[in-house]
Regions:
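N-terminal cationic and glycine-rich segments that engage phosphates or anionic surfaces
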Residues: 1-126, 131-142, 239-242
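Positively charged, low-complexity, intrinsically disordered RNA-binding extensions
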Residues: 140-245
């Protein structure tokens, strides 16, 4: 099976998360709290949203103790953390489509900050729906086979038998995509067979990609993504910039 791998689009984000692990854990903890409160349960078997966030936490090497403490905190009667999910859409340099998902306790703080990033480094923030139509929501699981521990055909068969929608190999990197509703089942089936992931989340995958040729556009796009990544309210940033291999 084939398809354009999004690995090149997340490599930079993954590296930034490794360099800023504490900040990454803080953002994931916020997602866990929201998942527990909205799902009404601290048991991932009874809370599919929590199960999805836990898969993301494990892929980011968040210790199990941290995950458990965060769940316990969310279940505690004294917890007053209240976050609202908000989504912003806009355009980066060269017309790159960008979607920003945030969890915030103050829209009046977050919206102007995100708008400033778009105005300074991109083409501005747009109305809801201006770019989201060009993305599909999918489960995306990334396996790194740089050490050659996995056989490509075996991984593909295991993934498809677990219910994955597609499989793509990009050098030593395997990308598995799923329907959102099948994501948790596929994760559980692959984990049961001993697979580990460098990334696992329900993501927005672009239908088409944009290449930037101007050095200025490339630098501004990198700055835009860095600013969004550094914002404590921003949880996820999706875009259709096709970086060079």
């Amino acid at each position: 099976m084939s398809g354009h791998s999004k690995w090149h689009n997340i490599q930079k984000t993954k590296g930034a998360a490794d360099a800023k692990r504490s900040a990454a854990f803080t953002k994931i903890a916020k997602e866990i709290i929201v998942a527990v409160k909205q799902g009404g349960s601290g048991d991932p078997a009874n809370n599919s949203r929590l199960a999805t966030v836990i898969a993301k936490a494990k892929a980011n090497n968040m210790p199990n103790d941290n995950i458990k403490r965060t769940i316990d905190k969310a279940l505690g009667s004294g917890n007053t953390d209240n976050y609202e999910s908000v989504t912003y859409e806009g355009y980066g340099p060269g017309g790159v489509a960008v979607i920003v998902e945030a969890l915030t306790d103050n829209r009046q703080r977050t919206a102007p900050e995100v708008r400033h990033y778009f105005d300074k480094f991109g083409k501005g923030m747009g109305a809801q729906g201006c770019v989201s139509w060009s993305f599909d929501r999918k489960g995306v699981i990334i396996i790194d086979n740089e050490d050659g521990d996995y056989d490509e055909d075996t991984v593909m068969m295991d993934a498809l038998e677990a219910g994955a929608a597609d499989f793509a190999a990009d050098g030593p990197v395997f990308e598995i995509t799923t329907d959102p509703d099948a994501f948790n089942d596929v994760i559980a089936a692959l984990e049961a067979k001993g697979y580990t992931f460098v990334s696992a989340d329900i993501s927005l995958v672009p239908q088409t990609y944009v290449k930037l040729t101007s050095e200025e556009d490339i630098k501004n796009m990198e700055k835009l993504l860095d600013m969004l990544d550094d914002n404590e309210d921003v949880q996820n940033t999706y875009h259709n910039w096709e970086t060079e291999d």
